[in-house]
Design a protein with these regions (language model features):
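Mg2+/Mn2+-dependent nuclease catalytic core
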Residues: 80-82, 92-93, 99-156
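Charged, glycine-rich intrinsically disordered N-terminal tails and low-complexity linkers that flank
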Residues: 1-87
Length: 156
């Protein structure tokens, strides 16, 4: 069974937990934010592995607890960089699919590490048994750093 099929089966089995079909939601939707409520996510992995006595980790843990206590479903603010990414991510996914020779790079809203639902990832695409994270830099600086110097932002 592929990563995609396993992830979608896992989500479908959790439909009664959420009260909606988690296989049909999109990343960034209110339902997706609810699914991430109080969950350690790969997007903040740098905060977790930083060490237990670091400010970044302590702040992240406090945010997770606050999110649960206050039922805060995440940052609702929009940034032009986020809007840019949402606009160009499908194009980047299509280009990656063509470059790698895969007919289709599928999207998964979110998948949990296990039934505890405490750790999750939201890959931008899945093909075969590989997950990918797609970046569509807002400005050319990061793209040029990567292309010319093989530099990638640590949080990526």
């Amino acid at each position: 069974m592929s990563i995609f099929d396993r992830a979608m089966a896992q989500l479908k089995a959790m439909e009664n937990v959420f009260g909606f079909d988690p296989t049909t939601i999109e990343q960034g939707s209110l339902e997706w934010k609810i699914m991430r409520l109080g969950v350690l996510t790969a997007s903040k992995a740098d905060k977790i592995v930083a060490g237990k006595d670091t400010d970044g980790r302590a702040t992240y843990m406090a945010e997770l607890i606050s999110d649960i206590v206050n039922c805060n479903s995440g940052d609702e603010s929009n940034f032009k960089q986020t809007d840019w990414g949402k606009l160009y991510e499908p194009e980047a996914r299509t280009a990656l699919s063509a470059a790698l020779g895969f007919a289709d790079i599928k999207e998964i809203p979110l998948t949990y590490k296990d039934q505890s639902m405490r750790i999750a990832v939201s890959p931008d695409g899945v093909f075969g048994n590989v997950c990918c994270e797609i970046k569509a830099p807002f400005d050319g600086t990061n793209h040029i750093k990567h292309a010319a110097f093989d530099k990638v932002k640590p949080e990526w």
